[in-house]
Amino acid sequence: MRKRILTLLLSTLMGTATMFATTHQSEFVRVSGPDLIQPNGQKLYIQGTNLGNWLNPEGYMFGLSRTNSAWMIDLMIKQAVGPDFAATFWKTFKDNYITRDDILFIKQQGANTIRLPFNYKLFTDEDYMGLTSQQDGFQRIDNVVAWCREAGLYLILDMHDCPGGQTGDNIDDGHGYPWLFESEQSQQLFCSIWQRIADRYKDEPVILGYELANEPIAHYFENKEDLNKQLEPLYKRAVKAIREVDPHHIILLGGARWNSDFYMFNDWTFDSQIMYTCHRYGGPATKEAIKDYIDFRDKTNLPMYMGEIGHNTDEWQAQFVKVMKKVNIGYTFWPYKKIDGSCMMGILRPELWDSIVVKYSETPRGTYQEWREARPNQQQFRQLLMQYAENSRFSNCHPQESYIQSLGLKQ
């Protein structure tokens, strides 16, 4: 099996056309009505996957439940084994989780696009994934850009976790409320980081576009309508900052309530290269289930793209792919890799992971006394963390064949 995969990767690499042979500023994917057009003039229908959990850890992809955001996972690891070993783990995790082999494999499966979720802290000196200064966000993205260029894949940069938190749930790695919309300081940082990213990649045709904020403004809050009214103005502010340095790349705008509500948008003509992005988990796999997305796409005459979909049966996914292709909504399934199934590449759960790591993550540690009482066996806990990092390496993961087939990437 492993030889077959490596052979396929090699043949994919050798057979890939030089999609990105030129770097002139005219060589970018562009918006044309409801379609995306490649530099060669051909239509681009997005098909691919998300590199979730790599630069934006989420608890369930580690097999954790109550410890479910990046800062919670990091705190749990530091409490268990100390900050220095936590930093060692995070570096190994980042080095192993996504590599050149992963990107070539994704291409070989038939994908043309990858969505890369990331945390804004990767572009600050805030404590994040083992670093407290000189964060490595650009280094990590530069690597993926190079691998995507080699494979012939487009890349969408998705700020999954924004300053202050844009969602109000674990997925934004914040503090339970979308403070981004009430903090001028956070908004300035949000726009500044996007401008820095755009300035670095302004001449890079591998980049399809910049997705400003993942799943902003959850439905939990009594003042959600007031928050929703602030979404479009903040998007415009960020677009303005980006356009000061990058006039070319597409900018992707997600709706509120898990990227499913678009009624708060009233102006879609303020920039010539914007598109919208929706998400869908659950519900019937029918055209009627995404009628609101289709209607908004038709109203704006701009592309609509399903940035996240998945975590369902193979049959449901295959049927939804047929629907999305029929209505011209491209897609990237979530996620590419995690513990267990429902992904392209499964990570083997280390032996004793549940009884030691998961159990510790659910043990009360709200006081220093509880913290001391919960302290695990150091050698055992450290070995399990490093085994998880090793198991996440491409050569140690397992392709989920039926899942991959359900994505319709080669059809």
Q: Where would I find each of the regions flagged by the language model?
A:
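A general structural signal for short secondary-structure junctions and capping/turn motifs
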Residues: M1-K3, F20, P39, V321-M324
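Bacterial Sec-dependent N-terminal signal peptides
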Residues: M1-T23
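Alpha-helical transmembrane segments and their juxtamembrane interfaces
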Residues: L13-M14, G168, A318
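A short, polar/charged loop/turn motif at coil->beta-strand junctions and beta-hairpin connectors
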Residues: T23-Q25, N40-Y45, F270
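Aromatic-rich peripheral "rim/lid" segments of glycoside hydrolase catalytic domains that contact
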Residues: W316-Q411
